[in-house]
Amino acid sequence: MRSSCVLLAALLALVAYYVYIPLPSAVSDPWKLMLLDATFRGAQQVSNLIHSLGLSHHLITLNFIIISFGKKSARSSPRVKVTDTDFDGVEVRVFEGPPKPDEPLRRSVVYIHGGGWALASAKISYYDQLCTAMAEELNAVIVSIEYRLVPQVYFPEQIHDVIRATKYFLQPEVLDKYKVDPGRVGVSGDSAGGNLAAALGQQFTYVESLKNKLKLQALIYPVLQALDFNTPSYQQSMNTPILPRHVMVRYWVDYFKGNYDFVEAMIVNNHTSLDVERAAALRARLDWTSLLPSSIKKNYKPVLQTIGDARIVKEIPQLLDAAASPLIAEQEVLQALPKTYILTCEHDVLRDDGIMYAKRLESAGVNVTLDHFEDGFHGCMIFTSWPTNFSVGIRTRDSYFKWLDQNL
């Protein structure tokens, strides 16, 4: 009996050691976040082990784990019709909310899920629940795009998928089929989905027939640039779950089918050092010393290497492509974008990407709402139901829905 108690105590101590990580005191539901992070870290470690044994790509394994625990079939409710179909060969899940009695045509949101361009699905419970609630509360049609993921495809194929599906949906006969008002269609996404939504919005500005098709864009803690991994938020939250800095950099490398040997050099900005001429012209477009307010900059210092590794952008030129990093787009492109909502979280490496994009859009004359949550962390908006229900998740979702309701 005594030996069993000792063994149990030892096991509990090991579990506590694995689960516990220091977190900012202001973050929402810290112990719940630790448990969520430990679960995700465990899945990542299993996936990396399987990868190292040569059995499967780590992202395929990790996504299999994620989807196995949460995939939902298309199931309608009394107020929301849910169907799986495809738009021009791209899988989508469509959520049809009830029309308002005085409005025969409904508004619509094209939604793009997050997951580092490699994980998750429009069909997992988190996004199914989000889009169902959005369709019901906004009396809207939500088109959630099931774009192809890394390592099945790499940049820019994810962008091509969301553009193809959205262009198909915007055809008059398709909008008519779903009883959607063509003047009330927006695009939205979270994290990597926010990146794709921003890229889609910018790509539409190049095509005259698509230029004014979107009424708004709503970007939820979007990832918007791959040039500077030492913004104040990257420095402040480098080890904060559920998106530590090294994980975000690896997602970028995976997206571009790059070499993992470059990750450590990229973390210290060796890929955009002063001797990398191609990066020089773009650096001013994300100069956080001028784009961020002093309350965000605090005492953080820019990390700009004099001599870096020019091989990185030579082998991964996509790092400097505005289609991948919407924050570095030219002013003329930004000027043509619609009304924008950007949600950012204090405890998120991507916080400053969103704040800088809001500033650049404002400077270009775009109507922007920046919605910042001091106790938020990356990914929080989809965590609204037990056992991963966070108070900040519910508040961010409600704030997002409210803005859409008032502006779409």
From Swiss-Prot:
PROSITE patterns: LIPASE_GDXG_SER
Alphabetical list of InterPro entries matching this protein: AB_hydrolase_3, AB_hydrolase_fold, Arylacetamide_deacetylase, GDXG_lipolytic_enzyme, Lipase_GDXG_put_SER_AS
Membrane-topology descriptor: Single-pass type II membrane protein
Short sequence motif Involved in the stabilization of the negatively charged intermediate by the formation of the oxyanion hole: positions: 113-115
Residues annotated as the enzyme's active site: 191, 348, 378
Entry-linked Pfam families: Abhydrolase_3
Keywords, alphabetical: Cell membrane, Endoplasmic reticulum, Glycoprotein, Hydrolase, Lipid degradation, Lipid metabolism, Membrane, Microsome, Signal-anchor, Transmembrane, Transmembrane helix
EC top class named in words: hydrolase
UniProt subcellular location: Cell membrane; Microsome
Cellular component GO terms, alphabetical: endoplasmic reticulum; membrane; plasma membrane
Mod. after translation: N-glycosylated.
Transmembrane domains' residue ranges: 5-25
EC number: 3.1.1.-, 3.1.1.71
Function noted in UniProt: Hydrolyzes 2-acetyl monoalkylglycerol ether (1-O-alkyl-2-acetyl-sn-glycerol), the penultimate precursor of the pathway for de novo synthesis of platelet-activating factor. May be responsible for the hydrolysis of cholesterol esters (such as cholesteryl (9Z-octadecenoate)) in macrophages. Also involved in organ detoxification by hydrolyzing exogenous organophosphorus compounds.
UniProt-recorded name of the protein: Neutral cholesterol ester hydrolase 1
Source species: Rattus norvegicus (Rat)
Gene field: Nceh1
